[in-house]
Amino acid sequence: MARMVNCIKLGREAEGLDLPPVPGELGKRIYESVSKEAWQQWVKYQTMLINENRLNLMDPRARKYLSEQMEKHFFEGGADAIGGFVPPAQ
């Protein structure tokens, strides 16, 4: 049976991650309170952040920026907006 979490991003109970996605305290917090579905949403958003901001992941500043954005995305109400991005109409 899948591990269920009360996902803070989706606001409902959903299947939890199998392992902490990142090391450290942030990874533990995400593991305990973020669902697989919400994590996949973050991965897509992170990809847009990397591409639109032309981040080089070899640069420690870029990795720090993404870590900060990840924390904002899940625990502080949202990450930085992506310049020029218009979400599709639903």
Curated annotation (Swiss-Prot):
Q: Which residues form the signal peptide?
A: none
Q: Does this UniProt record's set of keywords contain Cytoplasm?
A: no
Tell me one Pfam family matched here. Answer: Iron_traffic
Which keywords belong to this entry? Iron
**Role according to the record:** Could be a mediator in iron transactions between iron acquisition and iron-requiring processes, such as synthesis and/or repair of Fe-S clusters in biosynthetic enzymes.
Specify the species: Azoarcus sp. (strain BH72)
Q: What is the name of the protein in this document?
A: Probable Fe(2+)-trafficking protein
Tell me which InterPro entries the record gives: Fe_traffick_prot_YggX (IPR007457), Fe_traffick_prot_YggX_sf (IPR036766)
